């Protein structure tokens, strides 16, 4: 009996401890009260896939109750997690982002095509052919030169960006090595034939279409079978209202835009359809009531043929929420993977959304708000279209579609390789060794090389123009009046800081930084207040943490054998600053040393340090575990009686144990156990591996092995999915998520988990920051923003000479870009013929001039509030991206003024002339006549109706406009000739919960200018 009671109490205690640990990780505390920023800092690593629905077995039955079909689908209905603090009546929204947007992912079209670049062919160690494309470009407002490389293989494309150095040459071998390709069966040879651009563009287009077709199925109240739904000849008034919200009604006869598989000649697929353009994507909707209806055919095969072959289908169902609801198992289709169920509530004029995704479809955003009810119809349209586009892209990553794409890529690459091999010994392939540096044009063959490059550019620009005219160009955001605040927008914190910053951390609204030559300084959040020196240069701090709830500053100072950890009371430092005492020196810090940490080269603290602060110091190949237990109340009382206590908190720390490793760790992270009772772990990275070390026993477990010749460890970030620990392991340009819970006693179960995933950064990061739902990579000259749950790219911004300074709370980074840089500097002005190979006869990119002797370049500090990234991802109301419906042909007419919201034109007079030339060129190609801008909407359909005669004349005109192409393509590139800016003085709607900022950085949203605009 007693044993049963003890066993029961033991289970209850374990359950209570797990719940307690979970609440602690969510920012709750039983002993102290953390600041708001501290709570956010603890929440940044908390995430849940439950926001994206849960997998359910859905069964449909007929009227007699017999089971017809069953299937496993992930259901998203905006439900609230039972342990969340949701308040009824509050809306929980997330930011709406297109994932993996084509204007960031279609590199070859954007950066290579129509520019002088180099292409190589070779075979790897497994005798699989591959192609490599390399270009040197500075297509950004900061004129930051970057090497961009694309590796084409049967498994897909791998993209990487490498920093440019005028003093260091870059070889093809080093580029391939950065892509983890070190062994070859045949070394790469350069391809000189300009026609290779067409084949490589075809390879890139295998990533998926830039245009989409979606099914729209109308279901009356009570209809539970697909035959009943497809047999609805007409829709209701509310359904017609919904269709008008989605897009515009177009006449299919003679339609020359994206047709989505519909007949545009003989009306065999209906007379009208719904069409729109959203952020550069052409969308065609297969509407069930607009497709041909047959009274004799009850199954409506013609309708099912189109809608059943759509990957994504919208189901508009009449009736209230209490009536029987649609289930995906009601539809007999092996091709449709995603269903969006839409219901309209006439009482409050709102739409309710529910998403069903086949189980194999990867997670995609944006997650549904809670509740998933939209009263703003434009807001609903934006959310729905982005959700559908992201859903179709995610479906293409399922095994079924991925295997088909891999077979197609393999066939295309092998076919292209076989076509090139007969010319291996001819002039088509350059015999230069793959270990040679990217070559310069030989002076003896300057004229020949100039002619070859001119032909290469001409072919590429003509190909780009044809792609644009055809409507297949990845020109996202061209047709939008997009001008909105993004959560990652930065604020100016300090301009023209004269010292190099080694490390830093936020202290309230201020920033504490350690410099290389001026000691430690406190920077206030005010341009009028000068920096305050806290420590002089005798104390060289290499790493620091400011823990306000603990009233503690931890710093690692000095190097080599003299390195140690120092601990200070923040209250003592603050008092010294306020009383304007003398600046502290290294000698003044003798009482603040943790002596046993002598020789420490790295340390790490636990993220959730509300109750117990744990520090692990690495001293060569030895780990020293240190703890400090003291509540905030005790700390406050000790401060109040500071006359009777010491200024140094050294005595409050205790050394727990030492753990020996087989090598010195390069990266460390502390992982909280599920109960907090002797089950904490330490993640260490060394050699070619990440290991987990049990804090209590010192036992090591292999977490991840890095299969690469060279390893550059970046970070190990502890994250907690629904309370269970996981790790984001970052090395080279790879990020891997590993789940390390649940624990079995003291042993973590580190078997492969279905929730594990990995993705590649486009550039090797120097630091990474996790702020759910985002993970940010800080590279040498860019910030790359992805989603934590799936690794999908959201945005890339170019920031020159970038360095992350602090990220424990708000994110601070430094850059050489001045605050008042010209924000209207168009990237297309300086991106003409940029290439690794010096293009004789063409203008080279304007690279920043090196500093002279004795010159020092000032740094500028910027801040991204963590509340914008973490807090607003759950609590911020969704704002419409202000994207208007567009009914237009993909080949745009630029005679009418583009609608701009508080924006300014960034084109000079010469740029406007180039724009006119490009516009006339396209009109000549299409055979269009000049139309007044006021009639643009009315004649947009007519613009797409090209006669056979015009189509024949188009081919003749193409040969006559090569000169106009070369002049105009720089403005045609991406079909964006006007950079729409959001100046700080413009009257743009700002979210209420966003702090007022000068907003020196703006992440531009035009096709070419995907950078931080400096204002």
Swiss-Prot record:
Keyword line: GTPase activation
One example GO MF annotation: GTPase activator activity
Domain CNH as annotated: residue spans: 498-812
BP term (GO), one: regulation of small GTPase mediated signal transduction
Region of interest (Disordered), ranges: 821-842, 924-1004
Domain of life: Eukaryota
One Pfam family per UniProt: Rap-GAP_dimer
Biased composition (Basic and acidic residues): 949-959
InterPro entries: CNH_dom (IPR001180), Rap/Ran-GAP_sf (IPR035974), Rap/Ran_GAP_dom (IPR000331), Rap1_Ran_GAP (IPR050989)
Residues annotated as domain Rap-GAP: 200-416
Protein name, UniProt field: GTPase-activating Rap/Ran-GAP domain-like protein 3
Protein encoded by which gene: garnl3
């Amino acid at each position: 009996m007693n044993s049963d009671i003890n066993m029961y109490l033991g289970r209850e205690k374990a359950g209570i401890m797990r719940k307690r640990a979970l609440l602690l990780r969510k920012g709750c505390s039983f002993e102290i009260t953390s600041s708001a920023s501290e709570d956010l800092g603890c929440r940044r690593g908390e995430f849940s896939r439950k926001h994206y629905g849960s997998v359910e077995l859905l069964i449909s039955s007929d009227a007699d109750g017999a089971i017809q079909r069953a299937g496993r689908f992930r259901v998203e209905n905006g439900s609230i997690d039972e342990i969340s603090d949701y308040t009824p009546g509050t809306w929980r929204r997330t930011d709406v982002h297109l994932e993996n947007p084509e204007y960031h992912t279609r590199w070859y079209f954007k950066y290579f095509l129509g520019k002088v670049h180099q292409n190589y062919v070779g075979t790897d160690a497994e005798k699989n052919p591959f192609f490599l494309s390399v270009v040197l470009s500075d297509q950004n407002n900061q004129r930051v030169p970057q090497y961009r490389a694309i590796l084409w293989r049967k498994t897909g494309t791998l993209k990487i960006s490498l920093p440019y150095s005028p003093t260091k040459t870059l070889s093809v071998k080093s580029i391939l090595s950065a892509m983890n390709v070190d062994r070859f069966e045949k070394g790469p040879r350069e391809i000189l034939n300009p026609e290779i651009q067409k084949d490589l563009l075809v390879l890139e287009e295998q990533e998926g279409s830039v245009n989409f077709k979606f099914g729209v199925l109308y279901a009356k109240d009570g209809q539970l079978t697909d035959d009943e739904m497809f047999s609805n000849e007409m829709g209701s008034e509310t359904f017609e209202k919904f269709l008008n919200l989605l897009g515009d009604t177009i006449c299919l006869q003679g339609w020359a835009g994206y047709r989505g598989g519909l007949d545009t000649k003989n009306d065999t697929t209906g007379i009208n359809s719904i069409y729109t353009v959203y952020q550069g994507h052409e969308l065609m909707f297969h509407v069930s009531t607009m497709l041909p209806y047959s009274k004799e055919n009850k199954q409506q095969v013609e309708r099912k043929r189109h809608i059943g072959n759509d990957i994504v289908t919208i189901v508009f169902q009449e009736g209230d929420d209490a009536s029987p609801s649609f289930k995906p198992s009601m539809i007999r289709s092996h091709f449709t993977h995603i269903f969006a169920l839409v219901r309209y509530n006439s009482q409050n004029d709102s739409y309710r959304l529910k998403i069903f995704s086949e189980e194999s479809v990867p997670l995609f955003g944006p997650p549904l708000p809670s509740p998933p009810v939209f009263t703003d119809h434009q807001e609903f349209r934006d959310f729905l279209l982005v959700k559908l586009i992201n859903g179709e892209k995610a479906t293409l990553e399922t095994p079924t579609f991925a295997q088909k794409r891999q077979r197609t890529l393999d066939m295309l690459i092998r076919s292209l390789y076989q076509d090139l091999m007969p010319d291996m010994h001819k002039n088509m392939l350059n015999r230069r060794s793959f270990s040679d540096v990217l070559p310069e044009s030989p002076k003896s063959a300057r004229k020949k090389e100039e002619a070859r490059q001119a032909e290469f550019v001409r072919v590429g620009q003509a190909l780009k123009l044809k792609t644009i005219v055809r409507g297949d160009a990845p020109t996202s955001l061209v047709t939008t009046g997009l001008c909105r605040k993004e959560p990652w927008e930065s604020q100016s914190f300090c301009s023209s800081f004269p010292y190099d910053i080694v490390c830093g951390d936020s202290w309230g609204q201020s920033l504490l930084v350690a410099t290389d030559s001026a000691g430690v300084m406190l920077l206030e959040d005010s341009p009028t207040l000068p920096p305050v020196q806290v420590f002089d240069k005798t104390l060289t701090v290499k790493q620091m943490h400011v823990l306000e709830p603990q009233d503690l500053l931890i710093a690692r100072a000095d190097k080599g054998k003299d390195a140690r950890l120092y601990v200070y009371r923040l209250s003592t430092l603050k008092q010294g600053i306020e009383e304007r005492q003398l600046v502290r020196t290294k000698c003044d810090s003798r009482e603040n040393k943790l002596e046993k940490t002598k020789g420490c080269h790295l340390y790490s603290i636990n993220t959730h340090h509300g109750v117990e602060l744990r520090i692990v110091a690495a001293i060569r190949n030895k780990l020293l575990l240190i703890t400090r237990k003291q509540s905030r109340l005790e700390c406050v009382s000790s401060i109040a009686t500071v006359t009777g206590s010491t200024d140094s908190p050294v005595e409050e720390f205790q050394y727990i144990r030492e753990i020996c490793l087989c090598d010195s760790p390069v990266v460390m992270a502390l992982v909280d156990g599920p109960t907090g009772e002797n089950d904490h772990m330490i993640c260490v990275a060394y050699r070619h591996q990440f290991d987990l070390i049990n804090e209590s026993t010192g036992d090591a477990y292999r977490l991840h092995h890095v299969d690469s010749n060279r390893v550059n460890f970046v970070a190990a970030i502890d994250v907690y999915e629904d309370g269970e620990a996981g790790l984001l392991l970052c090395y080279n340009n790879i990020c891997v998520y590993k789940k390390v819970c649940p624990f079995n006693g003291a042993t973590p179960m580190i078997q492969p988990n279905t929730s594990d995933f990995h993705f590649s950064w486009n550039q090797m990061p120097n630091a990474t920051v996790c702020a759910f739902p985002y993970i940010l990579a800080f590279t040498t000259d860019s910030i790359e923003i992805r989603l934590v749950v799936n690794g999908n790219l959201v945005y890339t911004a170019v920031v020159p000479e970038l360095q992350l300074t602090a990220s424990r709370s708000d994110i601070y980074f430094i850059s050489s870009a001045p605050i008042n840089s010209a924000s209207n500097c168009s990237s297309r002005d300086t991106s003409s013929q940029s290439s690794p190979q010096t293009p004789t006869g063409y203008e080279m990119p304007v690279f920043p001039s090196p500093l002279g002797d004795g010159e020092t370049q000032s740094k500028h500090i910027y801040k991204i509030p963590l509340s914008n990234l973490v807090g607003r991802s759950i609590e911020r109301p969704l704002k419409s991206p202000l994207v208007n419906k567009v009914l237009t042909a993909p080949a745009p007419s630029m005679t009418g003024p583009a609608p701009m919201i508080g924006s300014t034109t960034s084109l000079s007079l010469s740029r406007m002339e180039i724009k006119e030339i490009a516009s006339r060129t396209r009109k000549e190609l299409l055979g269009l006549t000049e139309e007044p801008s006021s009639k643009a909407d009315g004649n947009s359909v007519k613009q797409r109706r090209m006669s056979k005669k015009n189509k024949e004349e188009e081919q003749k005109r193409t040969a006559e406009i090569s000169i106009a192409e070369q002049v105009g393509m720089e403005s045609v590139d991406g079909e964006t000739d006007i950079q729409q800016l959001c100046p700080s003085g413009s009257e743009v709607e700002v979210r209420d919960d966003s702090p007022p900022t000068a907003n020196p950085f703006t992440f531009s949203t035009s096709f070419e200018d995907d950078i931080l605009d400096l204002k």
